[in-house]
Design a protein with these regions (language model features):
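A broad structural signal for short, well-ordered beta-strand segments within beta-sheet-rich domains
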Residues: 17-20, 45, 232-234
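Active-site Asp-x-Gly
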Residues: 59, 227-295, 328-337
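ATP-dependent phospho-/nucleotidyl transfer catalytic cores
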Residues: 24-28, 51-62, 119-132, 147-217, ...
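Helix-rich C-terminal or lid/interface subdomains of diverse kinases
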Residues: 165, 281-359
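Amphipathic alpha-helical segments that form well-ordered structural scaffolds
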Residues: 9-10, 140, 191-198, 282, ...
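Juxta-kinase regulatory segment immediately upstream of eukaryotic protein kinase catalytic domains
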Residues: 1-24
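A structural signal for well-ordered alpha-helical scaffolds and beta->alpha junctions
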Residues: 3-4, 68, 280, 341
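Conserved ATP-binding subdomain of kinase catalytic cores across diverse folds
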Residues: 22-40, 45-172, 246-248, 259-260, ...
Length: 363
């Protein structure tokens, strides 16, 4: 039994039956502390996920859990309406005995979910089929929530994908140059400025109503999709801490940014970095097959723009952090954030080089 926290006392607060057998660290997440709980319920082992919420990153736990409660309940009802299996196809919160969605113990905040049996998350793509199935899962997630009023959600990370605001932050970092690094990255600074027209591509369309406000996941990587152990199919989307109002183009674009790179996100040698157009088409096919008619034509036409925009924005954030002294993203070596930024910028250049083909794949 892991003894990091008073697990018996914490678990006792939740509405779970049986006696506690074990509570051990689980998974490879970096934001929250995740544990697999095993209970003995009349001789039958039952599993749950217990998480200690990172309230340094998410200080307003009430708002965080408000979002998760609304989204998981809406997903559950949507799955039931379609004759699905809600305990396997979406996250299910376990309430505390007093009806709350989380509990606090010694200044630490905990929540509990039903453990989804017979499914696994993967840190990297084993073959293109995995990427396709992650696209299906995120497309289905968007489809399940298509009728949800996204204005009900709080922005737990304000202006997270407001690229105009990100650009303003970047310009301030360049002007202040608190670490004296601006001169060495002058070419990268000029590169970002020369493509600043990208900043308003999506956010302005949301403001004008051309693109609808949707529930967005905001961390659409493969490791946030549970794949069925038996079939390999995308089963459920997890890690809902960053669900907020936004555009489907953001979620689609972030998946492409992360998954269609021939190299690691922090590859120092940009000669190894290439945009994998075939994987882009694979993901697009899976996503559109699952999102169905819930996506508008305007959204469809802007999916390629979302891919370019999210990659540009991410690279700009890495460069901003480098200029500010590496205070946001965890680094493991000198110039780590600069290497990350250059990787993203190389991807943007390659995306733009074949951009005329990207919208055609949507048709």
């Amino acid at each position: 039994m892991n003894n990091e926290f008073a697990f018996p006392r914490i678990i006792e607060k939740f509405s779970v039956a049986g006696e506690l057998i074990s509570c051990e660290r689980y998974g490879e997440g970096h934001i929250n502390d995740t544990f697999k709980v095993t209970m003995d319920d009349c001789g039958r082992e039952v599993h749950y996920i217990l998480q200690r919420i990172n309230n340094r990153l998410f200080p307003d736990v009430d708002r965080l859990m408000h979002n998760i409660e609304l989204v998981t309940e809406f997903c559950r009802k949507s799955v039931i309406e379609r004759g699905g299996a809600p305990m396997r196809e979406c996250l299910t919160l376990i309430r505390t005995k007093d009806g709350a969605s989380y509990t606090c113990e010694d200044g630490n905040y905990f929540r509990m979910y039903v453990f989804i049996e017979g499914a696994t998350t993967y840190q990297s793509v084993r073959d293109p089929r995995d990427f396709y199935e992650s696209a299906v899962a995120f497309g289905k997630f968007a489809n399940l929530l298509a009728k949800f009023d996204a204005s009900q959600l709080y922005e737990v990370l304000p202006d997270f994908h407001n690229t105009r605001v990100r650009y303003e932050n970047f310009l301030r970092a360049v002007e202040k140059d608190i670490c004296g690094r601006a001169e060495e990255v002058r070419s990268e600074i000029d590169w970002v400025k020369s493509r600043s027209d990208l900043c308003g591509k999506i956010v302005d369309k949301i403001a004008s109503g051309e693109i609808p406000l949707r529930v967005t996941h905001n961390d659409t990587k493969l490791n946030n999709v549970m794949l069925d152990d038996a079939t390999g199919k995308g089963l459920a989307v997890i890690d809902l801490d960053t669900v907020m109002p936004g555009s489907l183009c953001y979620d689609f674009g972030d998946s492409i940014r992360f998954g269609c790179n021939s190299a690691a996100e922090d590859e120092p040698d940009t000669e190894k970095v290439h945009f994998l157009f075939d994987l882009y088409k694979t993901y697009l096919d899976g996503y559109l097959s699952a999102v169905g008619n819930s996506v508008t034509q305007e959204e469809k036409e802007n999916l390629p723009t979302g891919a370019v925009l999210m990659t540009y924005e991410c690279g700009m954030r890495f460069l901003t952090d480098y200029l500010e002294g590496d205070v946001y993203f965890r680094t493991h070596r000198a110039r780590h954030n600069l290497e990350r930024a250059r990787t993203q910028f190389k991807l943007v250049d390659e995306m733009l080089a074949c951009f005329s083909q990207m919208p055609a794949a949507v048709k």
